[in-house]
């Protein structure tokens, strides 16, 4: 009997640690569904692993396993932060890994909340799994200004189901991915219960029908390209190393690089675009340079956009900005209306919360240019070559609702300027590009992305890359890109239809549960 008890305890012990192993492996696998790997089916594999551990009968095991899943997922998924914290923030490698782990542990709270709610409400329905996940992802993208990085919907941009995005956005695509994974999970679980043959068949049929309809939705085009309004755009990629970018001794070298890239293309293209904070000094300090740029642009009829660091002379705010030169309707001047100022700033990168307390603690809280202030949440379009551009600077492009709110009736293009040199040769810039592509697909507008070290691209209104410059070289990329006319359902309604459907699913599920309880009592 003692031997039998030992065997049973050993099996129980092994089962628990097998669950932990499944959690870590499936969490890590989830990252391979995102760019640059793009193995999109692994999103479903990762979520199946999460559902397996979340449904563990013992709540404490389920919660710990979910934490391990999330640590594997987020530690690997945001590992690119090590580059900026260690190499450019001056933190030791140990401190850098600790801070990334701390962020991952915080982000793990949201999947753990998912598991807690699944256990608390004894969830079995696939659609309710998706509703709860949508709630926790909403919270992750909102609390403390939000960090909606690594949403599973992004992995599906190159899958057969990408057509969901123009209707329900990346949130809807995430909902579908979780729902489909939950249906598969319930399907596999039902196979081991002979009494549930009808449930097996119902789940299989439902998955086939909805999966087929979702794949078919990719054939629906809500917008069309207007080729006769195409303009030639040149992206100037200076490839300035981040450790040199803010070095005062390298300023004139940076200026010379961009002067050369601009001069080579003046008169040969309609519009030249430089990346985020292209020139590492206050725009106000080199006003004569921009006045010269204005004259050259007007003479050659090539308009220019530049990412700058600008101090508003009225408010005194330090702003991450985009200015234009050569526009006959908006001549260059520091306080021109034809300017965009970044609204959604990067915590600790562009501003430091609790600044007076944190800055003295460690050099990691003293990154270059970490004292910006926010521009308005909704701003006018930038105008160049009689075309309207809806801008987002760097990190802002991951906030789909903010980008949607800045879309105007006359918007021709989405524009994003970035400096991904902060993240070196890591997976970060590729994930960032994938999210930018999703904005184009959701809103049905072509996207232009100008960066310092790459990845500079032109993207069509279906989220497909039209032209791409290599990373880490000084170069220009020119493409004749046409605007798109029409509206996607998501561009008009945003996330409200999905949230309304989620609420409806919850109400129906609650009503059915109530009816079942009443019938059992009777």
Swiss-Prot record:
The lineage of its organism: Bacteria, Pseudomonadati, Pseudomonadota, Gammaproteobacteria, Pasteurellales. Residues 236-483 form the CN hydrolase domain. GO terms for biological process: lipoprotein biosynthetic process. CDD domains: ALP_N-acyl_transferase. Its EC number is 2.3.1.269. It is a multi-pass membrane protein. Keywords: Acyltransferase, Cell inner membrane, Cell membrane, Membrane, Transferase, Transmembrane, Transmembrane helix. It is an enzyme of class 2 (transferase). The active site is at 276 (proton acceptor), 342, 394 (nucleophile). It comes from the Bacteria. The chain crosses the membrane at residues 17-37, 61-81, 98-118, 127-147, 164-184, 197-217, 495-515. Belongs to the CN hydrolase family. Apolipoprotein N-acyltransferase subfamily. Its main location: membrane. Coiled coil: none annotated. GO terms for molecular function: N-acyltransferase activity. This is Apolipoprotein N-acyltransferase. Catalyzes the phospholipid dependent N-acylation of the N-terminal cysteine of apolipoprotein, the last step in lipoprotein maturation. It holds the Pfam family CN_hydrolase. GO terms for cellular component: plasma membrane. Pathway: Protein modification; lipoprotein biosynthesis (N-acyl transfer). It is found in: Cell inner membrane.
């Amino acid at each position: 009997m003692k031997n039998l008890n030992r065997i049973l305890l050993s099996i129980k012990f092994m089962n628990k640690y097998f669950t932990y192993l499944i959690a870590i492996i499936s969490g890590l696998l989830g990252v391979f569904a995102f760019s640059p790997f793009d193995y999109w089916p692994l999103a479903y594999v990762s979520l199946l692993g999460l559902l397996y551990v979340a449904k563990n009968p013992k709540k404490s095991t389920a919660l710990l396993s979910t934490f391990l899943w999330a640590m594997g997922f987020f530690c690997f998924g945001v590992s690119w932060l090590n580059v900026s914290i260690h190499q450019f923030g001056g933190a030791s490698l140990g401190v850098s890994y600790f801070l990334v782990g701390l962020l991952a542990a915080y982000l793990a709270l949201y999947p753990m909340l998912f598991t807690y709610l699944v256990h608390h409400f004894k969830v079995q329905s696939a659609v309710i799994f998706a509703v709860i996940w949508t709630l926790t992802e909403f919270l992750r993208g909102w609390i403390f200004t939000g960090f909606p990085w690594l949403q599973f919907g992004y992995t599906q941009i190159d899958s057969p189901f990408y057509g969901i995005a123009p209707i329900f956005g990346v949130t809807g695509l995430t909902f579908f991915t979780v729902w489909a994974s939950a249906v598969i999970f319930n399907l596999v679980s039902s196979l081991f219960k002979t009494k549930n043959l009808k449930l097996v068949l119902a789940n299989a049929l439902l998955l086939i029908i909805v999966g087929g309809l979702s794949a078919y939705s990719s054939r629906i085009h809500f917008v069309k390209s207007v080729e006769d309004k195409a303009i030639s755009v040149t992206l100037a990629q200076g490839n300035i190393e981040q450790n040199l970018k803010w070095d005062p001794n390298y300023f004139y070298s940076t200026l010379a690089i961009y002067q050369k890239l601009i001069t080579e293309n003046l008169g040969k293209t309609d519009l030249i675009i430089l990346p985020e904070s292209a020139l590492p000094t206050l725009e106000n300090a080199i006003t004569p340079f921009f006045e010269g740029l204005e004259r050259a642009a007007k003479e050659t009829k090539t308009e220019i956009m530049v990412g700058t660091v600008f101090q508003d002379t009225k408010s005194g705010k330090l702003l991450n900005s985009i200015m234009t030169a050569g526009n006959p309707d908006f001549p260059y001047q520091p306080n021109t209306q034809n300017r965009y100022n970044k609204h959604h700033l990067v915590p600790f990168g562009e501003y430091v919360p609790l600044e007076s307390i944190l800055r003295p603690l460690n050099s990691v809280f003293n990154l270059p240019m970490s004292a910006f202030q926010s521009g308005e949440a909704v701003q006018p379009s930038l105008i160049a070559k009689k075309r309207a551009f809806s801008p987002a600077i760097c990190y802002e492009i991951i906030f789909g609702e903010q980008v949607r709110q800045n879309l105007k009736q006359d918007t021709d293009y989405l524009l994003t300027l970035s400096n991904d040199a902060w993240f070196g040769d890591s997976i970060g810039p590729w994930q960032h590009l994938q999210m930018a592509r999703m904005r184009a697909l959701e809103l049905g507008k072509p996207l232009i992305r100008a960066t310092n070290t790459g990845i500079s691209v032109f993207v069509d209104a279906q989220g497909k890359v039209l032209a791409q410059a290599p990373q880490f070289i000084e170069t220009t990329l020119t493409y004749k890109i046409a605007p798109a006319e029409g509206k996607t359902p998501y561009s008009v309604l945003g996330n409200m239809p999905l949230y309304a459907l989620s609420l409806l699913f919850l109400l129906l599920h609650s009503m059915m549960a109530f009816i079942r309880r009443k019938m059992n009592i009777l």
